[in-house]
UniProtKB/Swiss-Prot annotation:
It catalyses: tRNA(Pro) + L-proline + ATP = L-prolyl-tRNA(Pro) + AMP + diphosphate. Belongs to the class-II aminoacyl-tRNA synthetase family. ProS type 3 subfamily. Catalyzes the attachment of proline to tRNA(Pro) in a two-step reaction: proline is first activated by ATP to form Pro-AMP and then transferred to the acceptor end of tRNA(Pro). The keyword Protein biosynthesis applies. Its EC number is 6.1.1.15. One of its GO terms (cellular component) is aminoacyl-tRNA synthetase multienzyme complex. This is Proline--tRNA ligase. It is found in: Cytoplasm. It holds the Pfam family ProRS-C_1. It comes from the Archaea.
Amino acid sequence: MRLVREARPHGREKLRSNLMEWFHWLLREAEIYDVRYPVKGAYVWRPYGMKIRRNVEALIRRLHDETGHEEVLFPVFIPYEFFGKESEHIRGFEKEVFWVSKGGEGGERLVLRPTSETAIMPMVKLWVQDYKDLPLRLYQIVSVFRAETKMTHPMIRLREISMFKEAHTVHVDREDAERQVREAVEIYKRIFDEMCLAYMINRRPDWDKFAGAVYTIAFDTVLPDGRALQIGTVHYLGTKFTEVFEVTYLAPDGSRRLAHTTSYGISERSIAAMLITHGDDAGTVIPPKLAPIQVVVVPIFYGEEEKGVVMPAAEQAAKALREAGFRVHVDGRDDKTPGWKFYYWELRGVPLRVEVGKRDVEGRQVVVARRDTLAKYAVAVDELVDAVKALLSEVEANLRRRAVEELRGRIVRVETVEAARAAIREGKVVELPWSGDNDCGLKLQELVGADALGVPMDSEASVGGFDLRDPACGKRAEVWLRLAERY
């Protein structure tokens, strides 16, 4: 494998200048998603987008199945008598709920699920009898509905979240449930690592935790415009839902005890984050393990005579790659120029392009181009499979490295409100000393003009032995609080 063109990646000026305009352009031109459906916050997945989505769903399913989770499918309707049982939960969701107020000639009042804790617990009560039935680990990938009143964004802020993976687990005690919380965090790290995403792990402040949770752990990434995007959450629910739904089990000593539960969710926001994080002014780069097409073969010919020489060689290269397990497409269209095809597949984020021209056939080689760097390599035909394997690994590693470096460069630690405001204006995530007092934290948000993401769980959270003061209320600081503008 010989380098024949140095790396010269596309710029990101258009992407950075107006991120949402760029994202709409990408979804439209790459035929991933159509935003023209005439219901606010409800959009259409196009065939290429569905291929990306199915690969992400397969990753999610694999990692849940491998860790003892079992897939289920619950109805979209939740009876109001179930939904209204947990008071904190209904207070948190009531303004976002779609109500089914009429069905045919009447009928009971129903809720379109915003999340499924109140749908699943009544059934768990029927399934769990004694401690031998626990732990119970369930998940489903479904649509959930939120009556968003804010501005909606494709994949990011929706009224129908159509790829909502929600896991619900039931345990004998807090210790076992919190062990599950830690495992859920590890599952999400593996998912986001395969998506080549950089992320922060934050314990949400009490005023921003999931409605009905004892505590919430969130995964946040930062988009190129400096705004944070929540891409996953894990909740320890304690006995809040099992108390109201009377989910108990028979313990070994013969007593009946309340079960403890957790839930954790991820949605198409993660796909939005992936497309944007790896995007540039020519389109996006889809991480190799998730790309519908990992290698596109572009035959380069002029006239029927060259076509007769080049096409068989292109098909032979594709055959060898498919037999090695790669997802390959040959773009043999003769009504499009090679340059047009290069643009088309770069827009769609295919990680590698194999170019086959007449001279390449004569020299028993091909040219392989990386989408992430645009570097090109001359590769002997009999070395193509090994070269593609190595280059796909390099593309994946480079995407992950770039994302991590960019996120690290955005997180700054400051001690004053003025410094925090200045950093937020520059698109940074700030860490400020915090006393842990909720009133002080809410005031910090107001003073800085940003949202609290929470206390870091991926780095040292304690202020240690430093005599730092909470800038909102003057109390002695105990931990660092992350703040950022966010979607």
